[in-house]
Amino acid sequence: MERDGDQLSARPTLETEGLRFLHVTVGSLLATYGWYIVFSCILLYVVFQKLSTRLRALRQRHLDQAAAALEPDIVVKRQEALAAARLKMQEELNAQVEKHKEKLRQLEEEKRRQKIEMWDSMQEGKSYKGNTRKPQEEDSPGPSTSSVIPKRKSDRKPLRGGGYNPLSGEGGGTCSWRPGRRGPSSGGUG
């Protein structure tokens, strides 16, 4: 019986040593890697949640496709809706193309009209640089441009007398411009 008592007393000491060893080992692991373990658990939880929602959506899609395969009416309705959407988009695209073609046609007509006006003004001896304002003047009521006689350059008076040139020093006045001296202002190069 003493042996049984010794064995019973030896068993709790082994168990307590094992528990102490486990406690020390787990405690040191948690002390060293505790935050890493916590963050990895949180990360695993988030990843699991994301994957579970995607798996649910994937299962739902499979169920919908299986139901659609079983019901041909749904497939026909989807194809008709897709064809109607394509037709609508094609009509919108065709309308945009027509608008663009009309705009290009108007621009070409405007360019052609400006070239004709420029040619006519050159035939009359006018400058063609001021033609950008002509279409606005044509819209306003008033005398037509063909009835107005263009002035010649010889009819105009010069703004100043022909003999005055302020840079040359000629043409009157007591002061005349002279260029400054070159070289140092004072002292020699000695």
Curated annotation (Swiss-Prot):
Compositionally biased intervals (Gly residues): 160-174
Instruction: State the UniProt keywords alphabetically.
Output: Cytoplasm, Endoplasmic reticulum, Membrane, Phosphoprotein, Selenocysteine, Transmembrane, Transmembrane helix, Ubl conjugation
Q: Does the keyword Lyase belong to this entry?
A: no
User: What kind of modification does the protein receive after translation?
Assistant: Truncated SELENOS proteins produced by failed UGA/Sec decoding are ubiquitinated by the CRL2(KLHDC2) and CRL2(KLHDC3) complexes, which recognizes the glycine (Gly) at the C-terminus of truncated SELENOS proteins. Truncated SELENOS proteins produced by failed UGA/Sec decoding are also ubiquitinated by the CRL5(KLHDC1) complex.
* Residue(s) carrying Phosphoserine: 140
Q: Where is this region: Disordered?
A: 115-190
Query: What is known about what this protein does?
Result: Involved in the degradation process of misfolded endoplasmic reticulum (ER) luminal proteins. Participates in the transfer of misfolded proteins from the ER to the cytosol, where they are destroyed by the proteasome in a ubiquitin-dependent manner. Probably acts by serving as a linker between DERL1, which mediates the retrotranslocation of misfolded proteins into the cytosol, and the ATPase complex VCP, which mediates the translocation and ubiquitination.
Subunit record text: Interacts with DERL1 and (via VIM motif) with VCP, suggesting that it forms a membrane complex with DERL1 that serves as a receptor for VCP. Also interacts with DERL2, DERL3 and SELENOK. The SELENOK-SELENOS complex interacts with VCP.
Q: What is this protein called?
A: Selenoprotein S
Q: Origin organism of this chain?
A: Bos taurus
